[in-house]
């Protein structure tokens, strides 16, 4: 599967892999930040910018919600 954000294209096998790729390439990630902490921080930023709450209980749901909000785009 291919997904695109404003900066990159991600080739992944699952939505969980997509979240992991976003985490690994994030410019907002702190050096010692965990995946869960990073997802919470992203959810806070999305809430502040767009007024939408994102469920970050799992990497799969997190990525699905980013796609459903149009923050990530599937490439066919």
Per-region residue spans from a language model:
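N-terminal acidic leader/helix
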Residues: 1-29
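Generic detector of bulky aromatic hydrophobic side chains
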Residues: 2-4, 41, 55, 62
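Acidic, aromatic-enriched beta-alpha/helix-loop junctions
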Residues: 24-51, 55
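Short, compact, well-ordered microdomains
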Residues: 52-76
